[in-house]
Amino acid sequence: MTQEVLERSIQVGGRTMTFQTGKIGKQAGGAIFCRYGDTVVSAFATGSAQPREGIDFFPLTVEFEERLYAAGKIPGGFIKREGRPSEKAILSARLIDRPIRPLFPEGYRNDVQVVAQVMSVDQDCASDITGINAASAALTISNVPFEGPVAAVTVGLIGDEFIINPTVEQSEKSVMHLTVAGTKDAVMMVEAGAQEVPEAQMLEAIMFGHREIQRIAEFIENYRLEALERNLAKPKQEVVMKQMPEEIVQAVKAFAYDKMDQAVRTEEKKAREEAIRQVKEEALAHFAEQYPEDLKTIDKILEDFVHKIVRRLITVEHIRPDGRALDEIRPISVEVGILPRTHGTGLFTRGQTQVLTVATLGAVGDEQILDGLGLEESKRYMHHYNFPPYSVGETRPMRGPGRREIGHGALAERALLPVIPNENDFPYTIRLVSEVLESNGSSSMASVCGSTLSLMDAGVPVKSPVAGIAMGLISEENHIAILSDIQGMEDHDGDMDFKVAGTSQGVTALQMDIKIKGVSREILERALTQAKEGRLFILDKMLSVIEKPRPELSPFAPRIITASIHPDKIREVIGPGGKTIKKIIDETGVKIDIEDDGRVFISAVDGEAGENALKIIQALTQEVEVGRIYNGRVTRIMDFGAFVEVIPGVLGLSGKEGLVHISQLAHGRVEKVEDVVKLGDEILVKATGIDKQGRLNLSRKEALPNPNPNPNGSTANKNPRNS
C-alpha cells in the first residue's frame, strides 16, 4: 500500500523547518510532523462533529505533551513515566492557545482539541515556537473552521541587531526574549522578557518578527492548498450559527435595554453587578409566561446588551464603567512591612484589586532544580501567584494552581528578573508569593508592583524598581479606544489585554492577548506610549512610600557568609559519606552549600553561628605553608622524633601534624626525644617540606635562634664592625 506524503520546508532563522503530513496520525482532523533543526513536534487537531449544548464559550483545549525520551532521559521516581505537565509545558500550551483562540468563528461551540507532542529536542530550536507553527498547520489542513494560519518566531536583540529564533548561545547575550505570533495581516500575540528595553525598540522588534511571520504564514497557506489537491487536507466544516429570533430580541430590547444601560453605568463593581443581575431577573420574570422555552436565549440577549453598552460607552461617549477617563489610573494605596516575622512584604491596592506579596530569602541550596527537556539548570529567583475564589466573591474548590495562575506567576517573575542582583552580589535564593486578596482586573500587574515593594522591604538591592500596568483596547466600527489600567468588565468585553511591566528606563516584560483578528502597528505604538505614562505614575506612588531598598535585611532573614576554598579541599569539608559537613551543621545549626568551583555559602539566622562554621571550615581546609613558623602541640613521641600538630583539629577530627625528627629537635646532639619535649608541650616549629607521600616535615631547630652561628663555635658577629 503506497501512502501519499506531503513534505515541504522553509528556512527560518538560518535553519530548516519542515512540515510533513500523510504519514502519521491520519485519523486526527489534521496531523503535522514538524521538524526544526533536530527538534520534532507532532501536532494533532481534532474537532467534534456537533456543537456542545448549553454552553456560552468556545470549548478549545490545547495540550503540550513533553516526552522525556525527546531529550534522551528516563523519568525519575518509582513509576518511570511522565506525570503531570511541567510548568514549562503549561506555559507552552498557553503560548499555543492564545494566538489561535481568536481565529475561530464567533459563536462556534464545537469541541476542538489541539495536542502538540514533543518527540525530539534540539536546545537551539525551541519546542514551543515549533509547537505553535505545527499546531497552526495542523488546524489549517484540518476540517476545523480555523481562520488562520498563524505563525510564530522568537526575536532576540544583541547590540543593535535583531535575531530570529536565537540559539542558546545567542540567547545568553541577548537583552530581549520576545515571542511574536500573528497572521499575514496582523500581530495576534506578544510575550516578552527584556532588560529595560525602550518602547520604541520593543515595537521595532515586534514588527521585525511579524515580517518573518508573514513569510511563514504564507508558506503554511500554500502548504494547505497543495495538501487539498492531494486529498491530504480536509474541506472546512460548515458553521451554522443559531440566530436569535428577531421578535424576541426586539421585545427584550424594548423592555430592558435602557434599564441595562443605567445598570452598566454604576461605578462600583459589586453594586454594578447587582444592578445588572436585577435587570436580568426582572426581564426573565417578565418574559417567563410569553417565552417559557426561550429563557436561556433571553439571558444571552441580555448579556449581549451589556457587551454592546460597555463598548459604546467607551468608544462613543468616552465613559468607562467606573467613571474614569480613558488614560486614568484607579486610586493607588501602598504599604510595606505589614507582617511582623516575614522577610519583606508589599501590599499594593489599585482600585478594587489588591495583592499582598511576601518575599522570603533562603540559602543557595534552596534554589529550584529544573530537570525537564531543557538543559539541567537551577532557579534562584521564583515568583508564585495565588488567585483564591474569595478574591472575586466566589466559592469553588481550591486544588492547587491552575494554568492561569502559573502563567501570571511566570509573567510577574519575568518582569522582576532583570533587576534581581546576581549571585555574587547577593548570594540568596529569593521566593516571592503574591496573594490576590481582591480582584477587579489587572491582578498580575499588581503582583509586579507588590513584588518590587516586598523586595525593597526585605533589603534586596534591586537595580531599579519595577511597576506594571494592563492596557485595553475597544475597537468599534471607526472608533478606537485605548484604556489604561483596565478593570474586569473592560477586560471581559474588550478586544485586548496588553500587560506592560518595566522600570523608568524601559520594558522588562510584555504580554498581549487579543480577541479580534489582530492589531496594527499604530495601535501597538499608542498602547506602549500610554502604558509608559501610566507606569511612571505608578512608580512615583510606590517610591513615595519606600524610596530604595532597606539598608539592612530583616532580623528573621538568614545571614549568608561566603568563602572560597580550593576545589581539591571540598572532600575534606564534606568528609567520608558527608560525616564532616553533617557534624559542622549539627554543631553550629547553619546551612552549608558548596559549589564545584570551591565557593562556600554558609547560611545562618544567628551571625555568630555562621562565623563559627566559617572558622571550622577554614581550619579544615587550611594549608600548611612551607617556611612558616607555627606554634604546635606535641601529640606523639617516638624514638626517632616527635609528632607535632601545627593546625588544631576541630569537631573531634584530627588536625594537621608533621614529624620533627630527633635531629631537628635542637641545635646540639639529642640523645633522647623526651630530654627536649614531652607529650602535650607547645613548641615553635618550622615547616621545612612535604615529601612525595604528602607527609609534613617540621624542624624545632630552625625555629629557634642558633647559639653557635659560626663554624668555630664563636658567638661573635660573622662580620665584625670595622674599628
From Swiss-Prot:
Its EC number is 2.7.7.8. Residues 696-723 are annotated as: Disordered. GO terms for molecular function: 3'-5'-RNA exonuclease activity; magnesium ion binding; polyribonucleotide nucleotidyltransferase activity; RNA binding. One of its GO terms (biological process) is RNA processing. Residues 558-617 form the KH domain. It is found in: Cytoplasm. It holds the Pfam family S1. The keyword Magnesium applies. The keyword Magnesium applies. Belongs to the polyribonucleotide nucleotidyltransferase family. This is Polyribonucleotide nucleotidyltransferase. It comes from Desulfitobacterium hafniense (strain DSM 10664 / DCB-2). The lineage of its organism: Bacteria, Bacillati, Bacillota, Clostridia, Eubacteriales.
